[in-house]
Design a protein with these regions (language model features):
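Short hydrophobic/aromatic beta-strand or adjacent loop that forms the aromatic wall/cage
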Residues: 35-37, 73, 110
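Short beta-strand/turn micro-motifs at beta-sheet edges
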Residues: 60-66
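Short, basic/glycine-rich phosphate-binding loops at helix/coil junctions
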Residues: 68-71
């Protein structure tokens, strides 16, 4: 047995704003959005992030999600092919309305920056030579 795809499920307060943000970054929707869900494909490795309305997400969790304004849930790392590409992603994220919580910086042999989406979910772009 093996898994074929991994999905992450997060809450969104505004599906249309989520669509605008991730579309502006160049990610493709995974199917058509509904009134409770929009889904995006990340990278070429079958990683999907579903963004559910807060009410639907709470139902799925059987509990309360974290408050992303004051708490952290996870940081998704997205790979880049070069330091220059990191800088291009930085400008794209800013233009799309993302909030930079960690300015570009060297990390060991790599180069990275961190941002939040409109709902406060944290991501970073990372260049790591040989990765």
């Amino acid at each position: 047995m093996k898994t074929r795809i991994i999905w992450a499920n997060l809450a969104t307060n505004d599906i249309q704003k989520t669509i605008q943000f991730y579309t502006a970054l160049g990610f493709k929707q995974n199917g058509k959005e509904t009134s409770e869900l929009v889904s995006f494909a990340f990278a070429d490795s079958n990683f999907i992030i579903n963004f559910f309305t807060a009410k639907r997400f709470e139902w799925a969790l059987k509990g309360k999600p974290v408050n992303t304004e004051t708490e952290n849930e996870i940081i998704f790392s997205l790979s880049a092919d070069s330091r220059e590409e990191i800088d291009l992603w930085l400008e794209k994220v800013k233009k799309a309305g993302g909030v930079i919580f960690s300015e570009p910086e060297d990390f060991e042999v790599g180069y990275t920056f961190g941002f939040t989406d409109p709902d406060g979910h944290k991501f970073n772009f990372l260049y790591w030579p040989g990765m």
